[in-house]
Amino acid sequence: MTTIDLNCDLGESFGAYKMGNDDEILPFVSSINVACGFHAGDPSVMRQTVEKAMQHNVAIGAHPGFPDLIGFGRRNMNVPASEVYDYVLYQIGALDGFVKAAGGKMHHVKPHGALYNMAATNPEIADAIAKAIYHINPSLLLYGLANSEAFIQAAEKYNITLVQEAFADRTYKQDGTLTSRTEENALIKNEEEAIKQVLQMVKEGYVNSVNGQKVAVQAQTICLHGDGEKAVQFARRIYRTFENNEISICTPK
């Protein structure tokens, strides 16, 4: 039977601001990425998200981003790799504290937004992220964009397990990278198209680029976004689609 991990970014509320559909999404995913306070989230939200994830037996990962709350971590920052290392180490350590306090064990690290996209094409950024993981806990998995040589090489250098990720509701360029969110066609808004794309990636190992070309994708985890208007409905549909197609949802080891 084909197996796949379903992951989702959660814990993005902070202070008086409520974001996402965390409680409703949790039953349909096998791993989550928790915002660590830089691009979203706050200490109380981090604790609550960890506790809820443990109740659902969902794998917990850190979701470090740039210190850009106003831009939700989606804006590139021109900082040296040494600062990226510091940012990532700091955020992993913060979440790990909450996970340990709740009696759990952290599973992975997935960079957020601009940090993720920069790492996918910039070996120095990817190296800084992998090095931070290695220094704090080399058993943590690294979630990174499928086919990214930067992620692959960084994981190999530090002997970290890379979990190659694809996206259910994002479009792809011909080189296998994600279409920038600044482009109108960055998101797949039609639910049927997104379901079709996910099945193609999981069952057939490819995705159609925005130019209509087939791009090979060997995905081990699929990212769902939990903050959209129909996010819960979409998560439920993907979950049931996988069941109907004999695709087992499970956490990567």
Swiss-Prot record:
Annotated coiled-coil segments of the chain: none
Cross-referenced InterPro entries: Glyco_hydro/deAcase_b/a-brl, LamB/YcsF/PxpA-like
Keyword annotations from UniProtKB, A to Z: ATP-binding, Hydrolase, Nucleotide-binding
Catalysed conversion reaction: 5-oxo-L-proline + ATP + 2 H2O = L-glutamate + ADP + phosphate + H(+)
Example GO biological process: carbohydrate metabolic process
Molecular function, one GO term: ATP binding
Record-linked CDD domains: LamB_YcsF_like
Subunit annotation: Forms a complex composed of PxpA, PxpB and PxpC.
UniProt cross-references to NCBIfam families, sorted A to Z: PRK05406.1-2, PRK05406.1-3, PRK05406.1-5
Membership in a protein family: Belongs to the LamB/PxpA family.
Official protein name in the record: 5-oxoprolinase subunit A
Species for this entry: Bacillus cereus (strain Q1)
Taxonomic lineage: Bacteria, Bacillati, Bacillota, Bacilli, Bacillales
Gene: pxpA
